[in-house]
Amino acid sequence: MASLTHIDAEGSARMVDVSDKAATTREALAEGRVAMAPATLELILSGNAKKGDVMGVARLAGIMAAKRTHELIPLCHPLMLTKVEVEVVPDSALPGLHVTARAKTTGQTGVEMEALTAVSVACLTIYDMAKAADRGMRIEGIRLLEKSGGASGHFRAEPPTD
């Protein structure tokens, strides 16, 4: 079993020293969903939500959050992100919105947390902007889908089994 890199020999939390790691291109893709009543999805898609453009604001919130990940998660390194892309897509089968975020950098540590933070905050923003219409919305399935670059190599998540 792999050891926890953020815990030292005495069991104390620490920021990992990445000084000796080579800078490589790193990319991560994460996803999440906001399930809601069909009428709420219809309201969002119509552009008539009281707080405005739910999907557009959620995209911007996700991008902004990715850039501030190191301020939100105590042991994350501040990264110079070269790309953050957040997509919010309607899913009538859910019903709700499917959110994906892709983060990219060239550096000494990965961007998984930035992609996950972008998805999380985008989903929270959707909830905040539509909660007046539907307090029963559910944020679901936030997970890392794929990562590449770095010493640990490539990772691709298995399809969900639910």
Swiss-Prot record:
Top class in the EC scheme: lyase
Pfam families, per the entry: MoaC
GO MF term list: cyclic pyranopterin monophosphate synthase activity
Binding site for substrate: L75, C76, H77, M113, E114
Pathway of action: Cofactor biosynthesis; molybdopterin biosynthesis
SUPFAM superfamilies linked to this entry: Molybdenum cofactor biosynthesis protein C, MoaC (SSF55040)
Reaction(s) the record says it catalyses: (8S)-3',8-cyclo-7,8-dihydroguanosine 5'-triphosphate = cyclic pyranopterin phosphate + diphosphate
Organism superkingdom: Bacteria
Keywords recorded for this protein, A-Z: Lyase, Molybdenum cofactor biosynthesis
GO biological process: Mo-molybdopterin cofactor biosynthetic process
Active site location: D128
NCBIfam families in alphabetical order: moaC (TIGR00581), PRK09364.1 (NF006870)
Protein name (record): Cyclic pyranopterin monophosphate synthase
Lineage: Bacteria, Pseudomonadati, Pseudomonadota, Alphaproteobacteria, Hyphomicrobiales
